[in-house]
Swiss-Prot record:
This is Probable RNA-dependent RNA polymerase 1. GO terms for cellular component: nuclear RNA-directed RNA polymerase complex. Belongs to the RdRP family. It comes from Oryza sativa subsp. japonica (Rice). It is an enzyme of class 2 (transferase). InterPro entries: RNA-dep_RNA_pol_euk-typ (IPR007855). Pfam families: RdRP. It catalyses: RNA(n) + a ribonucleoside 5'-triphosphate = RNA(n+1) + diphosphate. The gene is RDR1.
C-alpha cells in the first residue's frame, strides 16, 4: 500500500486485509499488487479544488498541475524496486477514497489479462458504468462454494405493470444451500435469511426460499456482465444489528413533526446505559450486544459471567471504558443514538406476493441469540442512509405473515403498488442496502410527504469500446467532481437555519443535487452546486474551528451541547493498579517453570501490537483490541480500515495461542499437560507489579495487559475452579466437624 502526496510518496508495508475475488485467484502474485491512495499533505482526501479551481468550466486549461500529475501516475504507472505498477481497477469504495489497485505485470500476466479474466465488459459503452463493473470483483468478500451454471435458475424481474423493477438486485437461495454457505462463512449457529453475494457477473442479494430446489435463482437485474467465474462470494448477510439515529434521520424526523424532547430523552437514555455499563455487570452484558462482534466480545462476556466486576478487573474495565468513550464520541460528532425498538436491516422482497403496498414484514431477534425471535406489528418508520429529502422517511404498517416467518433480521418489502418502497427511501434497491427500521411510537412522525423522484440522469453512450485510458481519466475527473460531502454539509447547515428545516427550498435543491452526486459513479453526470448554496457560516455542532460559526438553536445543537457535558474516563494500568488488582487466584503450582518463556512471548506480542498501533496511529491498547477506535492517523479511516485492523489483531492473538500450545514441547513435539501453569505464568508476567513497565523500556508506550487474555478460556477455568473450591470449603468443614 502507498499514499501519493502532492509532492511526496509514502510507502506502507503489507497489511492484513479482507480478501477479494481477484487477489484470491492471483494469490501467487500477491507481491505484484499495490493499493495507491491520492491524498494531500495532511494525509487527507484530495479536494476538488486541488485539481480544478471552483470557477473551472471543465476545460483542460482549467486543470491544475496536480490533476495532470494524478492522471500521469495512473496512465504511466509508478516504478518501485524495479517493478512498474500499472493501473488495474478500483472498487466503488476505493473510488470514494481516491484509491485504486495497481499491478506489476510479469511474463505471462499483465493487468489487462486480469481484467479479461474478470469478465466480458465489451457491451458496456458508458465509462462510469464500465469502471463500476470492473470494480465489482474487488469488493471485500468471503469465498464459499462453487455452483455450476446448470444449478442456477434464471427468474424474471417483477415490474408489476410499472416502470419500476420491484425485484431490483434480489434473487433466491434454497434453504439447504443457504446452510452450506453459512458453514463456509463460519456461521455454525444459524443460516442467515439473506446473503449479499457476487457470482460471476451477478451482484445483489439472495434470500432463502424454503420451497426452492435450485441452489440459486437469479434475475436479470442482478446480471452486470458476463463471466465464467462460478464461485459464490459473500460480502454480507442478514444478522442482528442495533438501530441508531443519526443527524440526517433526526433532521428529517424533526422536520416531519417529531418533538425535540423525544430525541433529547433518547440521548439521555443512551448515556445512562453507557454510564451504568462501567459499574453494573448486567448493564455491561446488555451493552456487549452493541460492541463490534467477535472474539473480544465473547471474552468480555465470559469475564462478566465468571463474576468479574466491570470496574475491578483492569482488562475488562479498560475495554468497557473505551467502548463507552467511543459511543460518547459518536453521540457528540454524529448524534448516533441507540434506539432499542429499532434495527438496521437488510432489505428483501416478498416472493409470496402476500404483502400489499404500504405493508412490510419484520421478524427480529432480541440480540445476537437468533433463537429469541419476535414479529413486529403496527406502524413502523423506515429510511435508508444517507437521506436528505423528507420523503425518504416512510411510515409503513408491519403485519404478521406466517408464511414469511423464515425471514428474520431483515425487512421484507412488498412487490405490489405503484412504486417499490425501497426506491422511495433515497432511491434504494434490494442489492444489499441496509435500512433503519423502528417501531418506537415516539419516533413515528405525524405526517409523511411524497418521496422524491430518483430516476437517474441519462448517461452518455460511446460509439466505441471503453478504453482503460478513459477509465483512468474518469477516476481523475471523479476527484474534480466529487461533491457528496460538500452537499451533505450544506444540507445540514440550511436544515439547521431555515424555518422549514429539510422542507426549505435550499434543502430540497440540495437533496436533488445529492441524488445526482450519488449516481455520478454510475452515470458520470456531475452535480454542480450553485453559488447561493455554498455555506458561509456553520453551526457549532459541526466543530468547524477554522470557519465562522454560530450557536445552533435546532435539535442537533441542543443534543450536541448536552452531550458535551459527559466526558469519557479511561483508567490506565499503573504500577499502583497492578499492586491493587493482581489476582492471587491465578497462581497455579508450577507456574515458575514457564516464567522465562512467558516473558519472551509477551515481549514479542507487545512489540507487534505496539507496531500495529504505531502503523495505524492508534493511541491505546484498549482501542485496537476492542475495535472501538477513538482516533487514528489521517491516512486511515475507521470506516475503510476497521476490517483490516480487526484481522491484524485477530492474527496476532491467534499467533499467541499457537505459541502457547508450543510452549515447553520436547524435540518430538510432545509435552505434559501443564496448560494451567503456563496460563498462570502468562498472567503473572503481565499483572504482577514486579514486571510492570519492563516490556516498554525504550518505547513511549504504556504497559500492555491484553497478552494473557489471548487464552482467556484457560484463565477463566482457573478462576472458576478457585471460586468453586472456596464455595465448597464451608461445607467440607461442616462435614469434617460432623465426623469428629
Amino acid at each position: 500500500m502507498m499514499d501519493w502526496f502532492m509532492s511526496t510518496v509514502y510507502f506502507y508495508g503489507p497489511e492484513i486485509n479482507v480478501s477479494n475475488r481477484v487477489v484470491r485467484n492471483f494469490s501467487s502474485d500477491i507481491e505484484n499488487f499495490l493499493r495507491i491512495s491520492f491524498v494531500d499533505e495532511d494525509c487527507e482526501k484530495l479536494r476538488a479544488t486541488d485539481l480544478s479551481p471552483r470557477s473551472a468550466s471543465g476545460h483542460d486549461a482549467n486543470r491544475t498541475a496536480l490533476y495532470k500529475r494524478v492522471l500521469s501516475v495512473l496512465s504511466d504507472g509508478i516504478t518501485i524496486g524495479g517493478k512498474n505498477f500499472e493501473f488495474l481497477a478500483f472498487s466503488s469504495s476505493q473510488l470514494r477514497d481516491n484509491s485504486a489497485w495497481m499491478f506489476a505485470s510479469r511474463q505471462g500476466l499483465a493487468a489487462s489479462d486480469i481484467r479479461t479474466w474478470m469478465g466480458d465488459f465489451r457491451n458496456i459503452r458508458n465509462v462510469a458504468k464500465y469502471a463500476a463493473r470492473l470494480g465489482q470483483s474487488f469488493s471485500s468478500s468471503t469465498e464459499t462454494l462453487k455452483v455450476q451454471k446448470y444449478e442456477v435458475e434464471e427468474i424474471s424481474d417483477i415490474k408489476n405493470g410499472t416502470q419500476h423493477v420491484f425485484s431490483d438486485g434480489i434473487g433466491k437461495i434454497s434453504s439447504a444451500f443457504a446452510n452450506e454457505v453459512a458453514m463456509k462463512c463460519n456461521l455454525k449457529r444459524f443460516a442467515p435469511s439473506a446473503f449479499q453475494i457476487r457470482y460471476g457477473g451477478y451482484k445483489g442479494v439472495v434470500a432463502v426460499d424454503p420451497t426452492s430446489r435450485w441452489k440459486l435463482s437469479l434475475r436479470k437485474s442482478m446480471l452486470k456482465f458476463q463471466s465464467d467465474n462460478i464461485t459464490v462470494d459473500v460480502l454480507a448477510y442478514s444478522k442482528y444489528q442495533p438501530g441508531f439515529l443519526n443527524r440526517q434521520l433526526i433532521t428529517l424526523l424533526s422536520t416531519l413533526g417529531v418533538r425535540d424532547s423525544v430525541f433529547e430523552q433518547k440521548q439521555e437514555e443512551a448515556v445512562n446505559q453507557l454510564n451504568k455499563m462501567v459499574t453494573d455487570p448486567q448493564a455491561a452484558i446488555e451493552a456487549i450486544e452493541l460492541m463490534p462482534m467477535g472474539e473480544i466480545t465473547n471474552a468480555v462476556k465470559e469475564l462478566l459471567l465468571c463474576g468479574y466486576q466491570p470496574d475491578d478487573e483492569p482488562y475488562l474495565s479498560m475495554l468497557l471504558q473505551t467502548f463507552r468513550a467511543s459511543k460518547l464520541l459518536e453521540l457528540k460528532t454524529k448524534s448516533r443514538i441507540l434506539i432499542p425498538k429499532g434495527r438496521a436491516m437488510m432489505g428483501c422482497l416478498d416472493e409470496t406476493r402476500t404483502l400489499k403496498y404500504g405493508q412490510v414484514f419484520i421478524r427480529a431477534t432480541s440480540g445476537v441469540n437468533d433463537n429469541d425471535r419476535f414479529t413486529v406489528t403496527g406502524k413502523v418508520v423506515i429510511a435508508k442512509n444517507p437521506c436528505l429529502h423528507p420523503g425518504d422517511i416512510r411510515i409503513l404498517h408491519a403485519v404478521d405473515v406466517p408464511v414469511l416467518h423464515h425471514m428474520f433480521n431483515c425487512v421484507v418489502f412488498p412487490q405490489q403498488g405503484p412504486r417499490p418502497h425501497p426506491n422511495e427511501c433515497s432511491g434504494s434497491d434490494l442489492d444489499g442496502d441496509i435500512y433503519f427500521v423502528s417501531w418506537d411510537p415516539s419516533l413515528i412522525p405525524p405526517r409523511m410527504v411524497t418521496p422524491m423522484d430518483y430516476t437517474p440522469a441519462p448517461t452518455e453512450t460511446l460509439d466505441h469500446d471503453v478504453t482503460i485510458e478513459e477509465v483512468e481519466e474518469y477516476f481523475t475527473n471523479y476527484i474534480v467532481n466529487e461533491s457528496l460531502g460538500m452537499i451533505a454539509n450544506a444540507h445540514v447547515v440550511f436544515a439547521d437555519k431555515e424555518d422549514l428545516k429539510a422542507e426549505s427550498s435550499p434543502c430540497i435543491e440540495l437533496a436533488k443535487l445529492f441524488s445526482i452526486a450519488v449516481d455520478f459513479p454510475k452515470t458520470g453526470v456531475p452535480a454542480l452546486i450553485p453559488p447561493e448554496l455554498h455555506v458561509k457560516e456553520y453551526p457549532d455542532f459541526m466543530e468547524k474551528l477554522d470557519k465562522v460559526t454560530y450557536e445552533s438553536k435546532g435539535v442537533i445543537g441542543k443534543l450536541y451541547r448536552e452531550i458535551k457535558k459527559h466526558t469519557p474516563h479511561i483508567k490506565h494500568f499503573t504500577r499502583e493498579v497492578a499492586r491493587r488488582s493482581y489476582d492471587t487466584d491465578m497462581i497455579v503450582d508450577g507456574y515458575e517453570d514457564y516464567i522465562t518463556e512467558a516473558m519472551a512471548l509477551k515481549d514479542e506480542y507487545d512489540f507487534k501490537l505496539g507496531n500495529l498501533m504505531d502503523h495505524y496511529g492508534i493511541k491505546s491498547e484498549a482501542e485496537i483490541i476492542s475495535g472501538c477506535i477513538l482516533k487514528m492517523a489521517k491516512n486511515f479511516t475507521k470506516k475503510s480500515d476497521a476490517d483490516a485492523i480487526r484481522l491484524a489483531v485477530r492474527s496476532l492473538r491467534k499467533e499467541a495461542r499457537s505459541r502457547f500450545s508450543e510452549m515447553s514441547l520436547d524435540d518430538n513435539g510432545h509435552g505434559h499437560d501443564a496448560s494451567e501453569a503456563k496460563a498462570s505464568a502468562w498472567y503473572h508476567v503481565t499483572y504482577h507489579p514486579e514486571f510492570w513497565g519492563c516490556y516498554n523500556e525504550g518505547y513511549e508506550r504504556p504497559h500492555f495487559i491484553s497478552f494473557p487474555w489471548c487464552i482467556y478460556e484457560k484463565l477463566l477455568r482457573i478462576k472458576q475452579r478457585r471460586k468453586f473450591v472456596r464455595k465448597m470449603q464451608p461445607e467440607l468443614f461442616s462435614l469434617h466437624n460432623l465426623r469428629i
